[in-house]
Amino acid sequence: MQIREIHFCEVCGSPYVELHHVVYRSENKNLENCKLNFVYLCQEHHRGTYGVHGSKGARLNRKLKLEFQNKLEELLDKQYLTREEINNILQIDDKALNRLLKRFSIQDYKYIKEDIIRACMDGKLIM
């Protein structure tokens, strides 16, 4: 018998949740299966008026994206990282990782931290 993980809404703590991709799949399909890109939200905070997909949800969407960006800043703890180090953090399949990194030049088999974060954020860093 497998024990199921219990998740709660990141905003209000409700136990009735839906999986949300912080960086939308339409923005960056490469992170579709990256657990760092997942948050759990109740129906109201996911699809409600003030939810991330709602007509007045821009503030919450921006907040979650900034938290994701900050998490990447923290986990990508060196200025230059190898492909393996990046994959250990993002834990995405090889094909997705190749697509994510293909447009960047490497120096001594390493990628620049800011380039990686920018790629994960669909080219838009939150300031």
Residues covered by each model-derived region:
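Short cysteine-rich loop/turn motifs with clustered Cys
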Residues: 1-18, 39-44
